[in-house]
């Protein structure tokens, strides 16, 4: 195994230590700083607006399979949205293009309403598989928006060309729309058609950012520290090779050249 060496073992030990350190620090109330993400801050405002208007909201967890990291991040956001909606006595409609996501989303939403003491507000028929085809999915979602008169739309997860097809009808209805995806090619379409957009790795940080749960928060900050270490090593390596040549002690220690 090419990378099974002492340097890799040391890196794993260092990164694991950083993450564990920040997790334990977060549990003691010193989780670290996370910069403000406007799109996530406006989720509560969107839920409150829909509640005041007495109209439901739509949450769409993307078109990726349930094991996709973007879908998993979206389901974390769904849990937060469902909890807030339950506390405010509002209704969340989940639409999806992936059948396997239906029972997972149903369990998340049901648990949120139950924990909020409002199990009567949960309706299994609000978790809807619409269509696997992109065009049919967009048409069916637009139909739900029109029939239900939704006031807030959340689009989080992995998206393909359907991103604009899904959000453009919502823009026409005047609903507040918040989107987030890790697919950079779809970001311009969300920016054009949504009120707020969560971009790239901000999606992965969403659950920790919204809930401030110590384990997730500490893990997120610890990973950022690890990235800083990697960046520092890369810069030091590049400088040392440029100034001292490929045979200098630092490069030899890192095992870049053999």
Q: Over which residues does each language-model region extend?
A:
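Hydrophobic alpha-helical transmembrane segments of small proteolipidic membrane proteins, enriched
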Residues: 1-38, 240-245
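Gly-rich Lys/Arg/Thr-decorated short loops/hinges at beta-loop-alpha junctions or inter-strand turns
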Residues: 22-30, 119-123, 186-188
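Soluble extracytoplasmic domains of inner/organellar membrane proteins
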Residues: 129-171, 176
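C-terminal functional extensions of proteins
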Residues: 191-258
